[in-house]
């Protein structure tokens, strides 16, 4: 009977073989997984008011408030600009507080009261800020204007409530409206056409009329 040599197994060989087995097993598992179509998440019911009217929606949980307003309620006055919360074109009011609707999920607003540019005024009865923007030519292309006006409305309410800002002379006192205050408080709203001076003039006019 011939002598058959004992197999010699090195530590390096064992490790290499184990690694190869893991790769093969993983590739087979990935192949099986990739064959399965991804299921869409089940829609979730959410109810909130928009411009005084209650809406009941069934939405994908990933739907932003901005997309709910534009794509589901067809309120296209609120604009999608950067979609990253950097330009302010999508600004709306939620319970009176301004937010970037592109950064907020619609399902977070169960029971909330949302106000868009359509809810501030109408062509026949414009909001004072809307009328002032027209008088002072506070826009050029107009794309950012709905967000600018919603933000300005909330900003004037913040000053009336005594909220100070980074540029306020006395953070413990009552803020005084100035051009510097307006520019600071409106800094989250970008106007790519550069109509900032006219925007400030429009807001100042309304603030003085309300004083």
Give residue ranges: language-model regions.
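Signature of N-terminal electron-transfer/Fe-S-associated modules in redox systems
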Residues: 2-211
């Amino acid at each position: 009977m011939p002598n058959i040599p004992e197999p010699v197994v090195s530590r390096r060989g064992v490790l290499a073989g184990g690694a190869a087995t893991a790769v093969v097993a993983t590739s087979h598992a990935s192949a099986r997984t990739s064959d399965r179509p991804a299921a869409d998440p089940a829609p979730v019911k959410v109810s909130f008011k928009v411009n005084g009217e209650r809406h009941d929606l069934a939405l994908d949980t990933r739907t932003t408030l901005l997309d709910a307003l534009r794509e589901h309620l067809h309120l296209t006055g609120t604009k999608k600009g950067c979609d990253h919360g950097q330009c302010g074109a999508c600004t709306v009011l939620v319970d009176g507080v301004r937010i970037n609707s592109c950064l907020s999920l619609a399902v977070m607003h169960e029971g909330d009261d949302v106000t868009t540019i359509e809810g501030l005024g109408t062509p026949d009865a414009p909001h004072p800020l809307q009328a002032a923007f027209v008088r002072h030519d506070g826009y050029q292309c107009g794309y950012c204007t709905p967000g600018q006006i919603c933000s300005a409305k909330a900003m004037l309410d913040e000053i009336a409530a005594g909220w100070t800002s980074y540029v306020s002379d006395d953070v413990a006192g009552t803020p005084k409206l100035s051009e510097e205050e307006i520019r600071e408080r409106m800094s989250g709203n970008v106007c790519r056409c550069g109509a900032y001076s006219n925007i400030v003039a429009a807001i100042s006019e309304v603030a003085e009329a309300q004083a």
